[in-house]
Amino acid sequence: MSWQAYVDDHLMCDIEGHEGHRLTAAAIVGHDGSVWAQSATFPQFKPEEMNGIMTDFNEPGHLAPTGLHLGGTKYMVIQGEAGAVIRGKKGSGGITIKKTGQALVFGIYEEPVTPGQCNMVVERLGDYLLEQGL
């Protein structure tokens, strides 16, 4: 399966039990910041934004004072899982980032999608990739 198929079929799909509700944007990005696959709506990010995200995975709490920035959008960092998941909130939407052995799985959402639904979609794919050694 291509990386684009993972984004299209496993991240940008309808939320289980909520037909028509889906993430706003999604991507799979290597630890080095190279985009493996992304939705057409995924924001163009700066290398320093990706560096900040990677630093927060290695040093949990790094982004808390400044917020998480992606594509020029600032998210307030909320409770995640140290070294494994970063979550951010902005207005009625937010972001979930799951770290795997080689990649970061991104999901961005707006209402009516809930934070929990975004977490479920992103973390399920991230956990699968981890099980596959990726």
UniProtKB/Swiss-Prot annotation:
This is Profilin-2. The keyword Phosphoprotein applies. GO terms for molecular function: actin monomer binding. It is found in: Cytoplasm, Cytoskeleton. The lineage of its organism: Eukaryota, Viridiplantae, Streptophyta, Embryophyta, Tracheophyta. The keyword Phosphoprotein applies. It comes from the Eukaryota. Pfam families: Profilin.
